[in-house]
Amino acid sequence: MQIFNTLTRQKEEFVPQVPGEYRIYVCGPTVYNYIHIGNARPLIVFDTLRRYLEYRGNKVFYVSNITDIDDKLIKKGQEEGTSMKEVAQRFEAEYLKDAAGLNCKKPTVQPRATEHIQQILDIVKDLIDSGHAYVAKNGDVYFRVKSDPEYGKLSHLKLDDLESGNRELRSQMDDDLKEDPADFAVWKAAKPGEPAWESPYGMGRPGWHIECSAMSRTHLGKTIDLHCGGQDLIFPHHENEIAQSECANGCEFARYWMHNGFINVDNQKMSKSLHNFFTVRDVANVYGYEPIRYFMLTAGYRMPLNYTVDLIESCKNSLERLYTCRENLDFALSKSEFSTDESLKAKADEARTKFCKAMDDDLNTPDALAAVFDLVKEINTLSASSTKEALEAAAKAFDEITDVLGLMYNRRKDEVPAEVTELVEKRAAAKKAKDWATADAIRAQLTEMGWAVKDTAQGPQLSKL
């Protein structure tokens, strides 16, 4: 499999340190509110990557964190008159509901930042002892950016350019606490009304960037195979993670980096001020969760993706085509007699090959979806004339592919009541006798009972309304 490595800006063969075992870290949410549709993109994209690696027979150690200590959480708690911990616990639960609704597998480990304070302090000590960090006069601890000659290698930004052109960095030069405006906090001295922990530098709390470094090192080791997140995290978050991790550990932090693109709404950047800000829950309440997952797979993960109502409705319609196809397969397989055409077997193998080729090409989910619909077309054309073995091969390929994409998870098998079966048989007899009035009346009765009947070449096909 080839992936685009942000570090080298090129596609590379994705080779783990240990053959058959991938160690992956994905930056998770800061749980101060419901996640928006932009937050859902990395959640779905990298869950799909994990599913594909596992489908190909690999073991994946997948760590995705919960940021439960942050300025935004503190502010939210102050606004609500409650504690940061209560805010974090409430919105972590809501995040987990959304993640489950989107059919994202649970991470191997889902660590919380507040549960890793000692591990964070261990890295801070390593950085101070090695001269890469220093304690300011107020008890803040800052990473000394100029001590790392490789700083900027992920974002491809030069330190001189940052210092001269970044007003934000210059404004962070607070009362001469920092040696350099580019230096960033790995530990923040306590402020009144904020949560704090004991440390050798006085009461305080961790900086944002070092939380991920500590959780990654604790659960995946000093060097991981892949680090993932949104493109907005490349600088400063991921750049700072690399600097502090490699300076503390003395080795490479992550061998590969993958970053997903942004979500726009009606071709505009999503923002509350433009009133085009949608949470996952907002969209799911109208369309369900599965169309959101499908939507995220319709474009290459590195490309911008434009959210519109028309597109999400189109995604819902595409999913209905998949569900209808699978129902038709079940119906064809339920028959007692089958035809003789074996060609659907080869079509199933062809779809599987196309799917894997697409996924091996930097997680090309649009082409992967195209492979699914190629198979749908063949199933719809050939199912009536196929052998049982060919139908089973098609069903197996269809289920494998859609499972890797995380789709078709709302599929249900409805038990047909005896009364409904009896009515279907009576309707078939009425049609055979050309008693159309009775046949139509029975169809209407079935509809009232919540069942749709479709006449096919293989006989009447039932589905739950």
Regions found by a protein language model. Name each.
Residues 66-70, 92-95, 105-120, 138-147:
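Short, glycine/charge-rich beta-strand/loop segments that flank catalytic centers
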Residues 8-13, 17-105, 458-462:
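N-terminal, positively charged nucleic-acid-binding surface of large information/translation enzymes
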Residues 1-32, 47, 97, 118-330:
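Alpha-helical recognition segments enriched in aromatics with Gly/Pro capping
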Residues 58, 132, 451:
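Short phosphate-binding/catalytic loops that engage adenosine nucleotides
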Residues 78-84, 108-114, 230:
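The substrate-binding groove and active-site-proximal loops of carbohydrate-active enzymes
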Residues 269-270, 277-465:
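Structural preference for alpha-helix termini/caps and helix-kink/transition segments
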